[in-house]
Amino acid sequence: MIAAIQFGLLFGVIHYLRPQNKVKPSLYWIYSLAVNALTLTMFGVGVLRIDNFALPEFSFSISNTLFITAALLQALFCRLLVKPLSRSIKVASAILVVFVFISIEYLRHHGTFEQRTLLMVVCISSLLVWQLLEQAQVRKRIESPQLIFLMYATYLELAFLCGRLAIVLTKTNVIRDIPEIPALLVFFTVGQIVMNTISYIAIGGFWAEKVAVANAITSKENIEIKSLLS
């Protein structure tokens, strides 16, 4: 259901990319939203088809890597609001994605559910901290209620991730099947995904603000031109 909400948001903002619009959403955010929605769908289908919890299908490695990719793209979007992306950041981002894929694939064969979760939580938490640092820089230059909303959503998503981390680190027995996953871990995971969705909504609102301002300026200019010609 959350994936459906994200796909709906994606289809709702695509019209901002029309050529006649002077202000267009960042493609990094669009790609992040698309990748995240696709990944949630893949996870949902994968969970329904899973046969061996100890050795999940290869698609789970792809899905986990895409989750990190979506968080990375959102972090790059926040960075782009502050300054252009340097070549070193782009190269480091590509290296991170490759590293995550190799690590997740290795843990799929030789690791546990807890180890895979730990890797994901640490990577996404690090990217969220980066996002918050960039968002703080943006707020110094741009006054926007949606940016404040985005920061709150990011803080809450990070809090849910910390909850997941605490549960995984304090759990003594190894989880070997889906029914063994603690209900509290499921709660924190769902909470994180919900906050992530809210952050996408906040960014969508931010772009809607920018488009509205640009349209208002254009309308004012058109009126001034007409008054000069009349």
For every predicted segment, state its role.
Residues E209-L228:
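Cytosolic signal-transmission helices at domain junctions
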Residues T189:
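General nucleic-acid-binding
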Residues M1-F7:
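Hydrophobic transmembrane alpha-helical segments in integral membrane proteins
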Residues F7-L27, A37-E180, V186, N196-T197, ...:
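Juxtamembrane segments at transmembrane-helix boundaries
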Residues G204, L228-L229:
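Short alpha-helical H-box segment flanking the phosphoacceptor histidine in two-component systems
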